[in-house]
């Protein structure tokens, strides 16, 4: 979120639960604490707001993954597993969509409709010195802090400042 928005998060609010997945599992007598559904809202320094709508048991729906970005000029949506990219522009009030082809070998090589494959390729090129590093350790640190803050917001039912997790 923060890399796409180009700003840092300042606060998060969330509602989440463990309602379907892993409930029948037990490790050392404890049920896993994996949240399998959530709504998470981040507010950013530049005034932007981002929402994560997570449901890890929505496989039998038309679009089991929907990624959206909304701005002053319109909206773009990425719909999986159909691999549709749809753009709606306020300038002409038209929706334009296209289906992005992903080779079967790539889908079979990783998860997330081929994204895992491309991430692994980029990482390998960076390790070999053939390309710049796309994400840094600092990006990873901030991503983990965002996850920790979101978990706190959900489990404590409150707004969490990113300062509380060291950002």
Where are these regions (language model features)?
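Rossmann-like dinucleotide-binding domain that binds NAD(P)(H)
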Residues: 1-62, 138
